[in-house]
A protein has these predicted regions:
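Auxiliary Fe-S-binding modules of radical SAM enzymes
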Residues: 1-20, 191-330
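N-terminal [4Fe-4S]-dependent radical SAM core
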Residues: 1-60, 64, 68-75, 323
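Conserved AdoMet/S-adenosylmethionine-binding subsite of the radical SAM
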Residues: 88-249
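Glycine-rich phosphate-binding "P-loop"
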Residues: 71-81, 100-105
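Short Fe-S-cluster ligation motifs
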Residues: 32-53, 88-105, 296, 307-309
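Short, charged beta->alpha transition segments
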Residues: 61, 83-92
């Protein structure tokens, strides 16, 4: 794999990132948004001490509702750091953590990530490496990380590809998510291996964020995982969605036309490159208890028994501010 002709993700932009920026608007340097001790991940990742998370800027998806929109918008630069600077910052925080190191939105910085891991190992540091991805991955990219990544933490956002195109500019999302998670399973299996303190050291946790008004999409995701992957996987079923202060999100809202839907939601017509699709005005609200309960019901009926659920009011607790040294205020 190379950044001279970057094809790390399904965008396959083939850009020479030593001379120009790719679809993600990133070059070949190490750009960092934040390196922080984070206590808000799933219990086997955060434990009581927290996980050291390195947040990369930009993203190979562009979800209109992104909760981390301050750093995920294409072209958001973060801070350019040297390899030594990044590793020094990580090394300072690791003794305070559960010895877990998470890379958040790493796909477009995969080669830089590998360099960081190798440099840390050369210094005698061997944290558990957590690959925190949106799931829009090439299986061959995931395959290249065998022996580097210990715990895979993919999102599985969509079963509805029309929805994926309209909300995230990723019309073929579900096939790539399925294939990439299958490769993760080949590497580490379906069992989440933990140490004697319950801290994850090897395995997979799949995250799914329930979107208000799109329960069918969430149930479809669970069905895809159960039927095509395994119901034995650990699922983190999140209810923490909230309407972001993303200027693009607010602008888009002002451009929508409103009608009444069968469910009582006003409909919003979104025009994009390939299709027209109507969405409920529900994206401007949080997930209701009724919606989340319906998804939980499918979780159990499809055979899942392992994972984590959130309180439906969890959206009040997840409000990162990446203008601060610690975006999570802890």
């Amino acid at each position: 794999m190379t950044l001279k002709a970057c094809n790390l993700c399904p965008r396959r932009c083939n850009t020479d990132r030593s001379r120009a920026v790719g679809w993600c608007r990133m070059d070949d340097r190490i750009h960092v948004s934040s390196i922080v001790l984070h206590r808000g991940e799933e219990p086997p990742l955060s434990g009581t001490k927290g996980i050291v998370n390195l947040f990369f800027p930009s993203c190979n998806m562009q979800c209109i509702y992104c909760q981390n929109w301050e750093i995920s918008r294409r072209g958001t630069q973060g801070i350019v750091m040297s390899l030594d600077e990044v590793c020094d910052a990580i090394a300072d925080l690791l003794p305070l953590s559960e010895n877990n190191l998470g890379f958040v939105s790493p796909t477009h910085f995969l080669l830089q990530m590998v360099s960081i891991v190798k440099e840390l190992r050369s210094r005698g540091l061997s944290p558990t490496i957590v690959y925190n991805t949106n799931g829009y991955e090439l299986p061959e990219t995931i395959r290249s990380l065998e022996g580097i990544v210990d715990v895979w933490l993919p999102d599985f956002k969509y079963s509805d590809d029309a929805l994926a195109e309209s909300l995230s500019l990723a019309p073929d999302y579900s096939q790539y998510a399925l294939r990439s998670v299958k490769e993760m399973m080949r590497q580490v299996g379906t069992t989440l291996h933990t140490d004697d303190r319950g801290i994850a050291r090897r395995g997979i946790i799949i995250r799914h964020l329930v979107l208000p008004g799109f329960v069918d999409n969430s149930i479809g995701v669970l069905r895809l995982i159960s039927e095509n992957l395994s119901p034995n996987l650990h699922i983190s079923l999140m209810s923490q969605y909230y309407p972001p202060d993303n200027p693009a999100f607010i602008y888009l809202k002002s451009k929508f036309s409103h009608d009444e839907s069968q469910e009582g939601y006003p409909l919003l017509r979104v025009r994009n490159r390939t299709s027209d699709i109507e969405h409920g005005d529900s994206l401007y609200h949080t997930v209701t208890r009724k919606e989340y309960k319906a998804v939980i019901g499918s979780f159990y009926s499809l055979g899942f028994t392992q994972g984590w659920l959130q309180d439906p009011i969890s959206h009040k607790n997840y409000r990162p501010d990446f203008s601060k040294d610690n975006p999570f205020g802890r």
